[in-house]
Amino acid sequence: MEHGEKNITIVDDKGNEQLCEVLFTFDSDQFNKSYVLYYPIEAQDDEEIEIHASSFVPNEAGEDGELMPIETEEEWDMIEETLNTFLADEDEEE
C-alpha cells in the first residue's frame, strides 16, 4: 500500500479477494500512522456504500504493503472527523 494508489485488493480471513477503490489516504502526526479509507468497487451507484478504514505503513520498495486494523477508539474518532471533513469538502465542490 502506498499513498496515491487508486485501487487495492483486500483479502478477507477466508482468502476471498475483493477489489476496492481508495477514497483517500492521509497521515496522522497524533498517532504517527498512515491511514487509508476505501470501499468495494462492486457497490452500486444507488446503494449506500460502506467505507472501510485501515492503517498502513507506506511502502518504499514497491512491494505490497500490509493493512492493519484500527486499534483504539481515539483513532476511530480522528478518522471519522477526517472523513466528515472530506465529505463536506466534496459536497462544497459539487
UniProtKB/Swiss-Prot annotation:
Record lineage: Bacteria, Bacillati, Bacillota, Bacilli, Bacillales
PANTHER family: UPF0473 PROTEIN CBO2561/CLC_2432, UPF0473 PROTEIN CBO2561_CLC_2432
Pfam family, one: DUF1292
Protein known as: UPF0473 protein BLi02866/BL02030
Lineage top rank: taxon: Bacteria
Entry's family note: Belongs to the UPF0473 family.
NCBIfam families named among the record's database cross-references: PRK13678.1-4 (NF010217), PRK13678.2-2 (NF010219), PRK13678.2-4 (NF010221)
Organism: Bacillus licheniformis (strain ATCC 14580 / DSM 13 / JCM 2505 / CCUG 7422 / NBRC 12200 / NCIMB 9375 / NCTC 10341 / NRRL NRS-1264 / Gibson 46)
